[in-house]
Amino acid sequence: MMYHIPGVLSPQDVARFREQLEQAEWVDGRITTGAQGAQVKNNQQVDTRSTLYAALQNEVLNAVNQNALFFAAALPRTLSTPLFNRYQNNETYGFHVDGAVRSHPQNGWMRTDLSATLFLSDPQSYDGGELVVNDTFGQHRVKLPAGDLVLYPSSSLHCVTPVTRGVRVASFMWIQSMIRDDKKRAMLFELDNNIQSLKSRYGESEEILSLLNLYHNLLREWSEI
């Protein structure tokens, strides 16, 4: 399943990020990908050795960790350190699949269940630059407002189309979920959404408490901690 998570960053946060990224050190984006991805990747990334990068990636982690919708959809166990990329002058990233595992500075290795892109450029400011994701439901073309995030299975083939005008800047990361199976995770997300909707409409009740108990028992049964 693919999820649109709006307002992960406020407009003020986005403006501050963009101002700081104007001063960042950018390097060839192929340094963080494998041999297959490097053949189709043509973009730039913020140098992860810089002091500015350390500060910005911490801010992204704080923002996603505080977002209730992100947590409900991803049920994250481990988040990778966020990276930042930039596309301009017809730069693109052809169809590829993300690696199944990635190194993690604290955990050694993590499984990539979900991929996330946090858009930092207004969609009207550039042409092209769509994230195209192929999954079992078809092809999705994604170009979201700055500050919004898209979450999709890392097993999906995806690409970024050439940016023919302007500059597309984004942050991206991977998530190991407590729930490995996409279908089970989607069912828990739907159940959680329905519980919250019923609570807001009718208040607390024995039936809602029973559904909440069901949610947590399923989470207990399926989760890998």
UniProtKB/Swiss-Prot annotation:
What's noted on cofactor binding?
A: Binds 1 Fe(2+) ion per subunit.
In which residues is Fe cation bound? Answer: 96, 98, 158
GO BP terms: namely: DNA damage response; intracellular iron ion homeostasis
Residues engaged in binding 2-oxoglutarate: 168
Ligase keyword on record: no
Cofactors: Fe(2+); L-ascorbate
Cross-referenced InterPro entries, in alphabetical order? Oxoglu/Fe-dep_dioxygenase_dom (IPR005123), PKHD_C (IPR041097), PKHD_hydroxylase (IPR023550), Pro_4_hyd_alph (IPR006620), Pro_4_hyd_alph_FE2OG_OXY (IPR044862)
Q: What class of enzyme is it?
A: oxidoreductase
Write the Enzyme Commission number(s) for this entry: 1.14.11.-
Q: Residues in domain Fe2OG dioxygenase?
A: 78-177
A Gene Ontology molecular function term for this protein is:
iron ion binding
Q: Which Gene3D superfamilies match?
A: q2cbj1_9rhob like domain (2.60.120.620), Rabenosyn, Rab binding domain (4.10.860.20)
Q: Which PANTHER family match?
A: PKHD-TYPE HYDROXYLASE YBIX
Question: What is the name of the protein in this document?
Answer: PKHD-type hydroxylase YbiX
- The organism is Escherichia coli (strain 55989 / EAEC)
**Organism placement in taxonomy:** Bacteria, Pseudomonadati, Pseudomonadota, Gammaproteobacteria, Enterobacterales
